[in-house]
Amino acid sequence: MRSLLTSLLLALILVGCSSPKTSYYKMSSAPIPTMSEADGKIRLMVGPVSVPERMDRPQLVVQSSGNEVQIYEYQRWAGSLKGDIARVVSASLARDLGTPNVWSFSDSTSTNFDYQILLDVQNIESSLDSGVVVDVLWTIKPASDKNKALVKNANPNSDTAPKSQTIMGRSLVSEATSGPGLDALVAAQSKAFARVGGEITQLMRR
């Protein structure tokens, strides 16, 4: 009997000392258009994507106060933050431009593209209370044989700016959360980066 009680006590201690269950998150993206004929549609490659060093980790990072961040050890990205950003922006571009020919740099070895979209994320402020603010520098870089096709300037307020073979721009987007918790926060991040893709689309259409 004493042996049984000892075994039960040890089992309870082990259960109490076990690590919490890890939860995994991913950003949601718009469905990519399906078309029976994709030939002749613009082809885009999104990436590489760079993010601040403090964000480039498997754990979710959340702003807990003005100068303090919290790293959630047991709440992690199912893939990677950079991969999710590329996927969401890719899906946004595909939907808005009406082309299925959009892929991320990290997911494909294909170099047969018309334009490459480089994303340099300067900051992601994620707060459970106030939502998300993302600051992204981006570059639309034509393939070598498409240089003459893209000669627009990224500043929409400039009428006399010189023509350029590459467009560079910046998106500062804020998105409120729809509810409490990390699920709502990741959903807000998804919407914010989809809006970044929308701003890139607007410039490509000009």
Where are these regions (language model features)?
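A structural "domain/chain start" motif
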Residues: 17-83, 206
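Sec-dependent bacterial lipoprotein signal peptides
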Residues: 1-17
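Surface-exposed short loop/turn segments
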Residues: 18-40, 96-163
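Generic beta-structure capping elements
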Residues: 47-49, 60-65, 139, 143, ...
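Short secondary-structure boundary motifs at beta->alpha junctions and helix caps
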Residues: 68-78, 145-199
